[in-house]
Every structure is written in C-alpha cells, then in structure tokens.
C-alpha cells in the first residue's frame, strides 16, 4: 500500500479511514475496521516526513487507535477474544501497521487479569526491534510506552523498570543513529530534528523515576549504572548533554546526594565537546533546592539531617581537581562557569566557609596563569566579570525569620565584605585582569557595599523586633586589616583618571604638548562619578567602624582606632594624585567629626574624672595632632593639584579655623586663618574671585570667639580689611571694606548661648565701623561712573541703617546727621543721572528697552526740588552683593545673569539702560525708612 504524497493528503486519508473504521466498529465489522486501520497506519511509513509533521500524524492516529482499543476492551470476549486477535494482527502485511496493531490489541488484552502480562510485554518490546528507521522506531516505542503506562504489573517493580530500561536503551540508539543518516551538509538539520525528538527519549527516564519512586537501592544498583553506561557508550554530544540533564532533573534529590561522586565521575568520560558546566549547574541547582526545602522545614536541619552533614563541597573539589588534571585542554570559557556553579553550591551549603571559596579562586588563578594572561579573550573577560562580581550567584538578603542560626552572612553586602577580608586568591585573580575589568568589578563591589536597601530593611526589622538576639543586618568593620584589604581592592579606581593619560614615553610625543595637556588636566574640574563614589566609600567605612553592634558581640571603636583607620584611608587615597581633590575633602570631613568626638570625650572626663590629668592631656594632644593631619591633607591637595583647587583649599582652611575656634584652640585657628590669607595672596588673581574669597574670610572671622585673646582677632580683621582696600576694582574695594565693617561689630550666635541685650562681651568698636564706612564712601564717590557710584552709596546707606538700628549712636558712631548727609549726597548723584538723560522719561524708556514690558515697567518722575525719584511699579532687575546684575522672571521665579554682558559693554547702550537700578534701590530704601517711623521715633528725623 502506498502512502500520501504530502502531509495534508496524509491527514485527509487518516481522517477518512478513521471515519470508516468507526462506522465498521459501530456495525461490529471488526475485520473491515482493522483493514481501514492498517491503511491509516500506512501513512506512518512515509520517509519524507519531518519529526514535526510525523508527530502531527501520530497524534491523530493515537486518538483513532484509542477508539479501537476501547471497542476491543468492551467486546471481549463476547464478540472476539483478544488473544486470538493478538495472533491475527501479526499477519498484517507491512511491519509498521502490524506493530501498531499488535501494541493496540496487546495493551487492550493487558487490561484483563487472565492475560499473561509479562509474556505479552516481552513479546511487544521484542517485536519493536523490527523497525530500525530512527523516526518510525522512536514513535513506535513511544506509543508502546504510552499504552503500557498504567498496565505494568504492580507486584514486580524490577520487571517494570527493566522493561522501561530496555525501551529507553533502544530509543536512545535510534535517536543517536538519526545523526549519522543522510549527507554531511544536512548535519545541522538533523541535529535540529534530533532536538525536536529528544522529549520522546527523556519521557522514558521520567517514567522510570515514577516507577522506582523512593527505592534507592534499585536506583543505585540497577538503574543508574545502566543509564550512565549507555550515556558514555553513545559518545554523542546531543545525547550526553540531554540525558544527563534529564537524569539530574527527574530523579530525587536524595538520590543525587548519595550518588554524587558517580555522577561527577561520569562527566569525566563524556565527549570532549560536551558542556560539562551546564550539567554540573543543573545538579547544583537540585542540591541547593534540597537544602532550601530542608531549612524551610526545619531551621536546625544542619544538626538533624545526616545528608546535610555530608562533605558535598569536598566531593566537588576532588572532582574539579581531577578534571583540571585530566582535561588541561578545557578552556576558560568552559572552566570558569564550572567553578562558578560550585561557588553557588558552597554559598548555599556552607555560607560561613570562605576557605572553600578561597580554594576555588586559587584553582581559577592557577588555570588563568596556565592559560596565559595574554590569551584571555573578550568573552573570557566577561566571564571573569560575572565570576568576580557574583552576578549569577543569586546572593540575596536572607530573611531573619528563616536564616539558620549559624549563618551571619545575611546579605550580599556582608558576603562581599567577608570575601574581600578573607579570600586572598580572589584579590590575586582580580589583580591579573585588565585595568578596565578591575574597575568594573570594583565599581560593582562598592555599589553592593554601599547599598542602602539592606540597612533600611534592617532598620524596619529592628523597629518591629524581627531580628533575633545577636543578629544584625548591619555590616561592621572590626579591625584595621579589613579596611586595608578593602582599600587594596579599590586601588584601580583610586588611581584612575577621567581621561587618557599623556603618552610621555612615546618618541613622537612633543614635550610642550605633553606639558600643556597635563596643565589642562590639572586645571580641569570635571565631575567624576567614580571619584564621587570613592568619597562616599570613605564616609561608609568610617560609619561602619563606629557602629556599636556586630552579629557576635558588642564593640565600640575607640577614638584612636578610628583615627588609625582614617590615616590608613588617607595613605591609600594619596596614590590617586590629582584625584585627591575629589576624595580628600571627605577624609578631612571625617577628621572634623573625630575632633568633635575628641572634645566630647574631654568634656566628659572633665565632668567625671577631673583629676586624671594624664588622660586629659592625652586627648588634648590628640586633638592638636588631628589638626596637623588635616593641615597635611590640605597641603597634599595643593601639591597634587597646584592652582586648580585654590578655592577648595581656601575654604577648607577657613572651615578648620572655625572648628578650632569652636574648640577654643585659638592658636590653631589663627594658623589656619593665616594659611587662608597666604592662599589669597599667592594663588588668587581674579578680581571677582578675590572679592568672594574676602567675603568668605570675613564671614568666617565674624563667627569666631576664641581669637579675641592675644590680639589674634585684631590682627586678622585688619589684614582682611587691608586686602579689601587693595582690590583691583574700586567697586570691589568699596564693597569689601563696608562688608569688613561687620568684623568690628559682633552679633549673637544662638548656638553657643549668646543673646543680644544679655551677653555683654561682644567685640564691638563703633569708631572702626565708621572708619570702614567712611573709607568705602570715599572710594564710591571717587568712581567716575555715576551709576556704579550711586549704587554703592545706596548700599553703604543700607549698612549705615543696619548699624543705626542695632546699636546706639554712642556705640556705633553712626549719627542721624551722617545718615542725612549721605542721603543728600545720593540725591545729588541721582540728579546727575537725570541730567545725563535730560529727563526722567528717558530712564523709563531705557527700562522698556530691556524687554521688561507691561506691568513691570518702572514709571519714574523726578522732583526738581529734592532730587528724589518716585517709581510706582516693581522692577525685575536686581544687583547682587558682588555687583552682579540679575534679570528676574516674575512668572516662573527664575533669574538670568546679565553680568557678563554688562562687563563687556562698558559705555554701550545696554550699560546705559541700567541706570534705573540705583534709582529703584534708593526708592526701596526710602520706603523702608518711612515704614520704620511708625515703630522707631529716631527715623522721624531722617529726611528722605
């Protein structure tokens, strides 16, 4: 009988013959129905069908044969006897239809108790040898397996397992044989088809695992050796990978645990191209799942379950050692994932044993050296990145309610830190990698260590009292050695640069070009995320050393211990060269914290142990020593960065001076202020920068209190004022001098308990205040530009009003006569501005030209008698304390600097249009004076 020429026609034939078969069965015409069935089964003889199409036909035929089997069972033995039919169907002409009919009739007969089950089963499986075509034979044996699934003898598991084993062995042979049929050019196609058929073979192992259930002795003595022998003997890549994976998946975890050595030894005899790491990883996953289930059922399972006491790691370690010895050809791409899978197992079974990890990393280290560092490909680099950063290790925070009591490694953060502290081989492997790879790994390590999520979870748990006694999710650094090892890991980032370094060694490099490139690098100040992260790391290290609890005991780091750690950090980060401008401020900040802590200890000792002079002297000397360390850090920044960080160095000196003053160390404070003035004199050249620096120095000096002794304060404020009077631009001189007037008029600092009207020892000298204001007024009056002169005079007037409000005339020497005279002088200058424009309307037009339209226009008019200027609308142009012009946007609250335009357009139209600024400023001041008359009678004699 011929078969259809296409799958579609074959399906049509099968459906037609199925309908005819069902009709004959309904009419009890069994022989005719068997004839239709035989014709239908002929379609399974088609050699041109792909596995996918063959499966489609098989499914339809299976349903049809199920109907036939149901009829046979229901009509036995009334209309026929199945034993006779079993003999009858063996006369079918073609072997494929014959065997399908035999299996259908035979399995139908097996449903009855009188049937000789074992003989029929043996006969059917033996007859299946008649089909040696791989695809036909596989589906035929799969059909036998499906039909006999529930019909095997219940009282003889040995026979059942042997039956399935025989079927599996033959199916595997057919499956492997498929690879060697056809021309070589179709090899990839056949491999793809084989993978489509692999589930048929794997189903036999699934069925086998169901039959043996928990019978370990049968599995160990009969099943596993036979299966592994077949796997090894077939020498087929696809078969070996798939079957070992199925073995690991379908049989019980306890079986794998007890036969672990046998399974691992089998992988040593596989085809060299087999991906061993995939098989081992599957096995590891099963073993880890077993541990997870045991710990979930019983947190104390490590002491009660004998399986968990087995040396599982030792078995894997011996296996890796033998594998590395017998397979020196194994590439890094194959070896590293294999080691990584064992690391995963070790982390699950032995979370506290870092010696195991050190062994594994030593093995990888040796393999890397044997392989040759120059031979490491980009793919291998990625594998090292995954290995060293533990991306595949699934390290997650262990819940405090399910964690074993002997496991302090509660998070990936804890694990990484302990790894760095205890595994020297890990650091050695990292050191062998390229600089770029080292940076990536260290970057990820720092991200893990500084992850806030774990600590936030710990905070929440501690509030709800979820943590058991002695358990903490916080990471605590216990000694200086741990810090040293952590910093040694971070060295690639510490010494890294934002851009490529100049190639000084190149013979083609121009010396001048190298010099200027280095100069540009030093002068640049670009935000570097890596260095910013390192600065965060410094704070993280110091915070972790100051925590009070670890998982084992309570520990309070002494001040000296923290100081040693901070000095260790400094000695490591000094290697960064120009990068210290990013990291040293964090170190200095932590020095400041330790200084305050030292002062708190001193105050405690003075209160509790005032007679212990030795201890008090020790902490006093320690405090002074820390200021020396800070001074050294600041000098290191200057030496490494030259003039590119003068602003930072100036501010650090001033902050140290303020802190020393707060700690009543007036000599140290004076030294830091002197150093700040030295930086100002030697390193600052830009006029605006000098003005800003002087303002910052004046602000810092004004807050000091301990410098009053020994005339330190007088010396410094006079020096500050003199520098202000020597600035390049007169407007800067004027502003600097009138701002320095505050240095002779101290104000309250509420944080130290001072209060105006109660504290009577404020440093105040009204005569010097008046001298500063008079000097600044003379400078303002000498400026040739009337607009700037008027603006500065208005600013000086505001300062005079400040002193007039906050002090008596006898103290400040700012008299009403002086204020009235200053107001008259301002009015006179404003008249000059009006005369320059010929009319006040021109000022209004100038404001309109600045695109300040509509409701923001300033409508100005001039009073010819007193020179005052009145405006009825608010302007949206203002001037800063340093002379910066700012145009305000009243709609969205934003502002735009126009200082640069003004600075480059002297005498231009735009500068001419800004004349309304001093006018408006003076108007606001006059309005303030008028408003103060209601609350202060002294303002009534000030004429505006």
From Swiss-Prot:
Keyword field: Membrane, Phosphoprotein, Protein transport, Transport
Membrane topology: Peripheral membrane protein
Residue numbers bearing the Phosphoserine modification: 846, 848, 868
Subcellular location: Membrane
Highest taxon in the source lineage: Eukaryota
Pfam families, per the entry: Vps35
One GO location term (cellular component): late endosome
Function: Plays a role in vesicular protein sorting. Required for the endosome-to-Golgi retrieval of the vacuolar protein sorting receptor VPS10. Vacuolar carboxypeptidase Y (CPY) sorting is completely dependent on the presence of functional VPS35. The latter may play a role in the function, modification or packaging of a CPY-specific receptor complex. Component of the membrane-associated retromer complex which is essential in endosome-to-Golgi retrograde transport. The VPS29-VPS26-VPS35 subcomplex may be involved in cargo selection.
Family as reported in the entry's similarity comment: Belongs to the VPS35 family.
Misc. comment: Present with 2360 molecules/cell in log phase SD medium.
The protein's name: Vacuolar protein sorting-associated protein 35
Organism of derivation: Saccharomyces cerevisiae (strain ATCC 204508 / S288c)
Name of the gene this protein is made from: VPS35
